Amino acid sequence: MKRIALFCLLFVPMSLWAQKQYFLPTGDSSMDEKDRPMIEVYLPQQEQANGCAVVLCPGGAMRWLSWESDVVKMAAFLNAHGIAAIGLRYHLNKGGGGMPRGAQMPPMVDVTHPDRFPQADANPMHNAHGDSIIHLAEQDAKAAIKMVREHAAEWNINKDKIGYLGFSAGGGVAIAATMSATAIERPNFLCSNYGPSLMPVTVPVDAPPLLIMTRADHPNVAAGLVALFMEWKKAGANAEIHMYGDGNGPYELMPETGATTTETWSRQLILWLKAKGFLSQR
């Protein structure tokens, strides 16, 4: 029955779930509205709400956002577990600054060499423009946490149960935001789904518990996330990692058919949140 319910959630249209949209103060009012940083709020039924809220940072290589898979479908899944979901639209690299045409591809690092990423920096192509976009997105992510805290009573959210779930590049954005957050911007938990750090990692003194999920054969990503896990542990912070052996790339919410262990990642997320006390009743 749970598998059937999850399968149905995968096809829930956006219009049924999005309840509120708020532009973030980090955006420029002169920007096209479709590009301005904003949050989209998806709230569970009030009688189901447990006070937990997850800010969803979708992937897309810092050039687009995988909104349907990483926000809309995940919001339906989280709402079904009593969790508020906050989709984040952050600054993107739409002005170039990537790898020049004809340039050699960066080396692909496998999971056995996390040492190739000092300070867990798994960004293979640093440049001034690209790094500036990451920093802008980082500010968006921090503003999102702050806005959720400011609306916590209105949205039936516990201020101490707000965290990130980042996918791919969105994981890098969430990690960067966590490292530089002030008290009101600080997440209570940090989850990265195949999203390594895009900047050198300095673990904050008050680092939140970290959950990492990825596939072992995902080039650069798996090694970068092992390096991130090690940085958290070396700092004495709480961290957990799930390294799935099947498949070699990104994935999304999926029904559990038994075909791969990766299918269980969303269940592991809920179990982890529950074990950390974030799903206990308000």
Predicted regions and their residues:
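Hydrophobic alpha-helical packing residues
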Residues: F77-G82, L228-K233, L273
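Bacterial Sec-dependent N-terminal signal peptides
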Residues: M1-K20
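The feature captures the conserved acid-bearing segment of alpha/beta-hydrolase catalytic domains
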Residues: N188-G245
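Residue-level signal for short, function-critical loop segments
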Residues: Q45, G60, S168, A216-D217
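C-terminal catalytic histidine-bearing segment of alpha/beta-hydrolase fold enzymes
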Residues: P37-Y42, M108, N238-R282
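Serine-hydrolase catalytic machinery in alpha/beta-hydrolase-like enzymes
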Residues: G27-V54, G59-W155
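Primarily recognizes the serine-hydrolase "nucleophile elbow" in alpha/beta-hydrolase
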Residues: H135-A207
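An N-terminal hydrophobic leader/cap segment in hydrolases
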Residues: S15-L43, Y164, A169-G170
